[in-house]
Amino acid sequence: MSVYQTREGLPSGWVAQWDAEYGTYFYVNESAQNPQPQWEPPVENLKLAPPPGATSVNTAVYNNNNNTSAANTNAAYNANTAANANANTATTTNAAATTSAAYNPNAPANTNAAYYPNAAATTTTNADGSDKGLFSGLTSSNGYTTGNSYSRPSYVAPVAAGLGGLALGGLASHALGNLFHHRGHNGGGFGGFGGGSGGPPPGPGGFGGFGGFGGEGHHHGGHGGFGGGPGGFEGGPGGFGGGPGGFGGGLGGFGGGPGGFGGGPGGHGGPGW
């Protein structure tokens, strides 16, 4: 199966491959010892034009919105133009009687040339003379079709991400709980730090994992987790509070991990005795 790839605007050794299902590119560092595909471009704010005949997801949304706006705008414009046709004709007739020569005797016959002397050199047209249109601001892909393709990047499912963070939190809580217990019986362990990453852009990603649970201590409960891992739209929640202690519960979690649109909530404090 042939795929579309390009190296336009990428560092040496990198290649971008078009994913027709998601309507976007993913990127591979072919110079790495173990090349791994990724959705994030290696260059910040890189904008590649889609392959010929293809449409990106964001562009499709843009076109639909603007087609609707254009239809409404043109209808209103045409109605106003028809209503004012006579007035415009009268104004144009009077304007023709007053020539520009009275103000600028040396004005060229083609006034556009005076204001836009380099218009011909800067016109954004294709080889056939047609306007480049919507993608004129994007980097030309200058790509090629090849049979040497890569598989799209995989990502951790949301449920698996949450369970993974919770498991990591439990392990960290147990290990650090033993450490603090042997240093003066002052508390249980800390929660976990883990969580899954988001899915491919521009769609939603997975949710971050949970922070760990705090352990029990002799004089003070353990602290809650330090938050879940990052997610596409929301980080995982913080730990669920410290375990009970001799003289007071541990602190709650210190906040969820970062997300595309907001971190998760913090944890809740444990009970005191």
UniProtKB/Swiss-Prot annotation:
Pfam families in the record: WW
GO cellular component, one term: nucleus
WW domain location: 8-44
Region of interest (Disordered), ranges: 191-273
Biased composition (Gly residues): 205-215, 223-273
InterPro entries in the record: WW_dom, WW_dom_sf
Protein name listed in UniProt: WW domain-containing protein C660.06
Lineage, highest ranks first: Eukaryota, Fungi, Dikarya, Ascomycota, Taphrinomycotina
